[in-house]
From Swiss-Prot:
Residues 291-543 form the Glutamine amidotransferase type-1 domain. SUPFAM superfamilies: Class I glutamine amidotransferase-like, P-loop containing nucleoside triphosphate hydrolases. CDD domains: CTPS_N (cd03113), GATase1_CTP_Synthase (cd01746). It catalyses: UTP + L-glutamine + ATP + H2O = CTP + L-glutamate + ADP + phosphate + 2 H(+); L-glutamine + H2O = L-glutamate + NH4(+); UTP + NH4(+) + ATP = CTP + ADP + phosphate + 2 H(+). ATP binds at residues 15-20, 72, 239-241. UTP binds at residues 14, 187-192, 223. This is CTP synthase. PROSITE patterns: GATASE_TYPE_1. Belongs to the CTP synthase family.
């Protein structure tokens, strides 16, 4: 099977949307019956994003096999119907770590280890390893051309054209074409300079995707084509749109997929984008609008909750409801500032770490429980829902998590036992930690649902498989008293009897789960828990009115 590689780089500025562009292009090529995978190369020194602050990097997307990866992999999965693995994302730190381990073992037979060839060879090997079962491999290189961190990756993809043949490689450069409102003009000079910098590395782009506030007119695209040495048909205008799900059609309308298929000499059927037409239609046509509050601590960067926000939108599509998402800093609720919660039709508390803002989250859950507002807790959102119920309903004021209070008298939430590097009782003391990265309960795990429960009804099956990312779990030894008071466990892991889902029966909709259902939601299908949560929030609005 001939393998063709499409390398996507970015220029001028960061955050232009290379991930969305790669995912959208992948979706079009997938619709042409091509076998697609997408790889994200991140130039930072961290081994993976698992220990990076969400405020700096955005969410950590967890794959089925338990890899902690860049949030762009979430876009890849949602757009191309393909599950990502640990092979689909690697970093400079990960590559150097691998090479240094080999050096320590003596695998290089005494050679002097250098960026070229050892680091670049390791990068190429990882790319090729991930491409085994695909005939089109899209590779997104993080960062911006000109960054010192990106140089080994750019050199590696330059070499790949030599190794596998230039006819099997396309270089796409995504660049900013700014619109100067005061002059009423689009400026192409930044793109020209960015391409010049790419040429200095030895890479001639084959296609330019030009991000701009407005459509780049033909005469400007001709100018870009002339100065950047690409055909005018290969200069694609990507204007700002109000929905990422419009991007596949926008690229298709400019025949980007035709250009690529002709370049690779692929005889494949035309792309059928009917499913994307349906998504766009659902996004525009709704019967109701509701307000969902996400109570979190990382709200300064909305990307910290990217998959959760997308899953809420997907659920809205399925219910013909427009979901207005409000990001609320949990610390703003700590002084019992319930006014900011009063207009909400549903409250969601997502995953997180640390004790900052916990009081505000506890108060938000209490407000949702007492005022019959639909509540959905995810990961940490389940753990603190249990703490709130134990403190305020059961009357166990000492109930807490050892994450927030290592010496608490009633540790209803405690460290997962017998996990690598975290079985020590003094694990919460920084000096006793060995590794934080990669030491949680990660990836897909089976869960058994209780008969006659809401979750069983929604999933319509007894055994489900969902993705996890947590270091703390419910302490089963202390939970019986809480369960007797009415907080039901309706899902447990098959292997270790871990509490996975809780429900409150005397409430319109109160459900929380230890796993992360947002990672498997798609714009076409949604996710059963999110869909019913939004449905219940819609009912709450009608009742409230």
């Amino acid at each position: 099977m001939t393998k063709n590689y499409i390398f996507i780089t970015g220029g001028v500025v960061s955050s232009l949307g290379k991930g969305i562009a790669a995912a959208s292009l992948g979706a079009i090529l997938k619709a042409r019956n091509l076998n697609i995978t997408i790889i994200k190369l991140d130039p930072y020194i961290n081994v993976d994003p698992g220990t990076i602050s969400p405020i700096q990097h955005g969410e950590v997307f967890v794959t089925e096999d338990g890899a902690e990866t860049d949030l762009d992999l979430g876009h890849y999965e949602r757009f191309i119907h393909t599950k990502m693995t640990f092979l689909n994302n690697f970093t400079t730190g990960g590559v150097y770590s691998q090479v240094l381990k080999k050096e320590r073992r003596g695998d290089y037979l005494g050679a002097t280890i250098q960026v070229i060839p050892h680091i670049t060879n390791a990068i190429k090997e990882r790319i090729i390893l991930c491409s085994e079962n695909s005939n089109i491999i899209l590779v997104e290189i993080g960062g911006t051309v000109g960054d010192i961190e990106s140089l080994p990756f750019l050199e590696a993809i330059r070499q790949m054209a030599v190794d596998i043949g230039r006819k099997n490689v396309i270089y796409i450069h995504l660049t900013l074409v700014p619109y100067i409102a005061t002059a009423g003009e689009i400026k192409t000079k930044p793109t020209q300079h960015s391409v010049k910098q790419l040429l200095s590395i030895g890479i001639q782009p084959d296609i330019l995707i030009c991000r701009s506030e407005k459509t780049v007119p033909l005469h400007e695209r001709k100018k870009i084509a002339l100065f950047c040495n690409v055909p005018v048909d290969a200069v694609i205008s990507l204007k700002d749109v109000n929905s990422i799900y419009k991007i596949p059609k926008l690229l298709k309308n400019q025949k980007l997929d035709d250009y690529i298929c002709n370049y690779f000499k692929l005889n494949v059927p035309e792309a059928d984008l009917q499913e994307w037409e349906e998504v766009i239609y659902a996004e525009k046509n709704f019967n109701n609008t509701i307000v969902i509050g996400i109570i979190g601590k990382y709200i300064k960067l909305p990307d910290a909750y990217k998959s959760v926000m997308e899953a809420l939108k997907h659920a809205g599509f399925k219910n013909k409801i427009k979901v207005d998402i409000q990001l609320i800093d949990s610390q703003e609720v700590e002084n019992k500032n319930f006014q900011i919660l009063k207009n909400l039709n549903g409250i969601l508390i997502p995953g997180g770490f640390g004790d900052r803002g916990i009081v505000g989250k506890l108060l938000s859950i209490q407000y949702a429980r007492e005022n019959h507002i639909p509540y959905f807790g995810i990961c940490l959102g389940m753990q603190i829902a249990i703490i709130e119920f134990a403190q305020n309903v059961v009357g166990i004021k000492e109930a807490n998590s050892t994450e927030f209070d290592p010496q608490c008298k009633y540790p209803i939430i405690d460290l997962i036992k017998n996990r690598p590097n975290n079985s020590s009782k003094n694990y919460n003391k920084i000096e006793n930690r060995i590794n934080l990265g990669g030491t949680m309960r990660l990836g897909s795990q089976p869960c058994k649902l209780s008969a006659n429960s809401l979750s069983r009804k929604l999933y319509n099956q007894e055994i489900i498989i969902e993705r996890h990312r947590h270091r703390y779990e419910v302490n089963n030894l202390l939970f019986k008293k809480i369960e007797a008071a009415g907080l039901q466990v309706t899902g447990r892991s098959q292997k270790n009897n871990v509490v996975e889902i809780i429900e409150l029966s005397n409430h319109p909709w109160f459900l929380a789960c230890q796993f992360h259902p947002e990672f498997t939601s798609t714009p076409r299908d949604g996710h059963p828990l999110f869909i019913d949560f939004i449905k219940s929030a819609g009912k709450h609005k009608k009742n409230f009115i």
